[in-house]
Amino acid sequence: MLKMGVLLFTFLVLFPLATLQLDADQPVERYADNKQDLNPDERMIFLFGGCCRMSSCQPPPVCNCCAKQDLNPDER
């Protein structure tokens, strides 16, 4: 009878508590919420990780990346 009580307690109380997700266990949602306020060009830089080489760069209508590199550090 004691074994049955321990088994029921484990599956009816402890197992559901272990499977609950707390708010702190979801960092991906907070990260996505922070990134949704950025404009699409800034998000593309995060996705691609960088810029083209200056020697192979196209004029600014095509390549926004090099145009941003030409800005003063205070304007970025």
Curated annotation (Swiss-Prot):
Expressed by the venom duct. Its main location: secreted. It comes from the Eukaryota. The cysteine framework is III (CC-C-C-CC). Classified in the M-1 branch, since 1 residue stands between the fourth and the fifth cysteine residues. Residues 1-24 form the signal peptide. InterPro entries: Conotoxin. This is Conotoxin Bu15. Residues 25-43 form a propeptide. Disulfide bonds join C51-C65, C52-C63, C57-C66.
